[in-house]
C-alpha cells in the first residue's frame, strides 16, 4: 500500500492528522485548479479551503478503487463551477458545432531556460489565463482538467455529468474560443498538457 493510500485509509477511519498530510500533498494542484478556474488569488485560496472541507466531510464515501487525485480535483472543479455560476460570469455562445480535433493543445513551458524565451512564455501564459476567463464555467473546467490535469475524456464526462461526445464537442469549442481570444493580441501559442502540480499561471 502506498503512503497516500495509507493516509486515505487512516483519514477514512477518523485520523485528522492523516487528512492533514493529504492536504499538504495536494494543496498546490488544488490551488492551481481553483486559480485557473476563478482567476483571482484570493478567490482561489477560499475555494481551495472549501474544496478540502468538502473532501473532509465526504472522505468516508470515497471509493479507494478510484484515484484519490481524480476524486479530490473533481470536488474542486464542481465547487469552482458552482461559484462561477453564482457570480453570473458572462457566457459565450456554444451554438457553433464542430468536429473533434485531435491536434495537440500546447501550453508554453514555464520552465524555459532562456531568459528572453521565458519572458515571452510568461506573457503567453498570462494571455492563456485571461482567455480561460472568457469561457463558460463547464467548458473552462473541461479544458483545464484535460490539458493541465490530464483527465481522460471519459473521466471528464463522469465528473462533469456529460456524455463523452459532449465533452469532445466542448473541448473543441473551448480550444477554438481560446485561440480566437488569444489572436486579438498575438498569434495563439500552441497548448500542450502540463502536470497538475506545475505553478499556477
Residue ranges and their predicted role:
Residues 84-107, 119, 189-192:
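Short, basic/polar amphipathic helix motif occurring as a linker/hinge flanking DNA-binding modules
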Residues 126-141, 145-166, 180:
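Helix-turn-helix DNA-binding module
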Residues 60-64, 74-95, 121, 173, ...:
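Arg/Lys-rich amphipathic alpha helix in sigma70-family domain 2
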Residues 10, 92, 130, 158-161, ...:
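C-terminal edge and immediately downstream basic/flexible tail or linker adjoining helix-turn-helix-like DNA-binding
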Residues 12-13, 39-40, 50-67, 86-88:
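Sigma70-family region 2
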Residues 2, 101-130:
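Acidic, proline/glycine-rich intrinsically disordered inter-domain spacer in sigma factors
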Residues 32, 46-53, 57, 66-78:
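Structural recognition of an alpha-helix C-terminal capping motif at a helix-to-coil junction
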Residues 12-21, 31-50, 164, 187-188:
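Short, charged helix-capping/linker segments at alpha-helix termini
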Amino acid at each position: 500500500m502506498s503512503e497516500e493510500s495509507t493516509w486515505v485509509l487512516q483519514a477514512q477511519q477518523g485520523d485528522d492528522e492523516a487528512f492533514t498530510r493529504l492536504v499538504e500533498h495536494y494543496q498546490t494542484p488544488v490551488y492551481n485548479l481553483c486559480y485557473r478556474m476563478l482567476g483571482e488569488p484570493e478567490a482561489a485560496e477560499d475555494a481551495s479551503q472549501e474544496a478540502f472541507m468538502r473532501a473532509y466531510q465526504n472522505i468516508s464515501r470515497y471509493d479507494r478503487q478510484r484515484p484519490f487525485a481524480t476524486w479530490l480535483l473533481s470536488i474542486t472543479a464542481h465547487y469552482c463551477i458552482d461559484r462561477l455560476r453564482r457570480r453570473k460570469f458572462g457566457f459565450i455562445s456554444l451554438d457553433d458545432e464542430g468536429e473533434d480535433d485531435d491536434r495537440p493543445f500546447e501550453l508554453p513551458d514555464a520552465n524555459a531556460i532562456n531568459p528572453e524565451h521565458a519572458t515571452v512564455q510568461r506573457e503567453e501564459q498570462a494571455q492563456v489565463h485571461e482567455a480561460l476567463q472568457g469561457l463558460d464555467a463547464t467548458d473552462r473546467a473541461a479544458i483545464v482538467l484535460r490539458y493541465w490535469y490530464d483527465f481522460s475524456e471519459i473521466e471528464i464526462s463522469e465528473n462533469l455529468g456529460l456524455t463523452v461526445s459532449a465533452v469532445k464537442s466542448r473541448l473543441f469549442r473551448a480550444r477554438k474560443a481560446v485561440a480566437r481570444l488569444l489572436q486579438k493580441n498575438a498569434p495563439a501559442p500552441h497548448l500542450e498538457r502540463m502536470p497538475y502540480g506545475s505553478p499556477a499561471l
